[in-house]
Amino acid sequence: MMLHIPEVLTAAQVVEIRKTIDTAEWVDGKATVGAQGAKVKRNRQLPELSATGLKVGQEILKALAGHPLFVSAALPMRYMPPLFNRYEGGEHYGFHVDGSVRSIPGSNLSLRTDLSCTLFLSEPEEYEGGELVVADTYGEHAVKLPAGDMILYPASSVHKVEPVTHGARISSFFWVQSMVADDGKRGLLFELDQNIQKLRARLGDCEEIIGLTGHYHNLLRQWAMV
């Protein structure tokens, strides 16, 4: 399931984050990928343990924790601390797939990468090119969202970032381990939850809504790994 999560950050939050990270030290993005990814990756990033990146990353995770659409879709259990990248002057990242398991920097924990997240920190009119292209069984999907919006998609997807030919594309990216590893099951739970919320707004907590809510939680109880 690929999902647009709007307004993760307010316009004011984006401005403050950009002020903070634009003046930070950026390094070659190849430092964070394996040999295969390094062949097709041309960008810059904040270092993984950058104090600036860690501080801003916590602000992003706090915002996500209060975003009901994200929580419903991702059913998050564990997060990779958000990273930050910058593309300009023709920089790009060719087709690749994210690693299935990553070590969480600064800890002894690992994370199964169920979901990939890209949070846009540049407005679309600030740069040319730079679309995130995600390939699945239905074809290729190009994504270029307003600053503060995020795209959520299965980490198993092959994807790339098109060359940025003008301006700068700045974003945050990270991975989520979900309570429900299977994308199909997670998608069913998301659709059920969204429909329950819509019906509840119209009908209130009637007997049928309570029954459907019970079915949702029974399925989650059966499928969740916590």
From Swiss-Prot:
Its keywords, alphabetically, are: Dioxygenase, Iron, Metal-binding, Oxidoreductase, Vitamin C
Known EC number: 1.14.11.-
Which residues hold 2-oxoglutarate?
Answer: 169
Please give one Pfam family short name: 2OG-FeII_Oxy_3
Q: List the disulfide bonds.
A: none
The record's remark on the cofactor is: Binds 1 Fe(2+) ion per subunit.
Domain of life per record: Bacteria
**Gene Ontology MF term list:** 2-oxoglutarate-dependent dioxygenase activity; iron ion binding; L-ascorbic acid binding
Name of protein: PKHD-type hydroxylase mma_3618
